[in-house]
């Protein structure tokens, strides 16, 4: 197999009534582990780099993007590369040269009209440069280390009528929706509003994306896919597996034993969560 456009993986999943898992990576070990997990279950996967991950790497996108691309090229399953939660126009414009075929542009923190205007501009640029683009409408909390709001509070979730208009007016290729999940959850105790998901799936013609999926048990993930979610974003679950393994295998000097354990733990987590979607 090899590196393939992430948007194509989502489109194929949507046509088959399935979902593709998209894992946020921070280190080379993340990328290697996710691909190992996908190979175990024989399913495609997406590697995602967020703007925050790029900031962690001193603002340099190319080194980690090229490493992820090299891992994807050597994979035994189709692997997409996606630039996630982009707010900076400067970073958005680096996507093509860095080898990304898709981006998620995040203006969801803005009021509706401003979100629409910013997203439409980003979508116009993305399409002119051959990129598939995802956007977000609603409040999927827990970003940037912030305490997540009540995901079921009035106004936090995505309105189906607004979603229909937003997609039509912005021209995006996929929409991340707020239906009860939150970013950065370390326990799998969240629950989704499946009635709202059904209304969104009926209202919106593009694939729907679920963010904050680490906090959902397997049954909720499976129900989300059955209800119309076509891309499932996962990040914190990998980090919980990684840091737990590092603590258990920490050595005085040589990093290889604990990084080996961390990679193995993340691969096991990735395989299990990919399988839960199938």
Question: Where in this protein do the model-derived segments appear?
Answer:
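Catalytic-site beta-strand/loop segments enriched in glycine and acidic/polar residues
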Residues: 23, 177, 202-206, 210
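Alpha/beta enzyme core
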Residues: 6-12, 16, 28-53, 61-75, ...
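Short active-site oxyanion
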Residues: 19-22, 79-80
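Glycine-rich beta-to-alpha transition loops that act as phosphate-gripper elements at the mouths
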Residues: 25, 81-87, 207-218
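C-terminal alpha-helical cap/extension of soluble enzyme domains
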Residues: 217-278
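N-terminal basic/disordered segments at the start of proteins
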Residues: 2-4, 22-28
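Cofactor-binding active-site loop characterized by glycine-rich and histidine/acidic residues
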Residues: 58
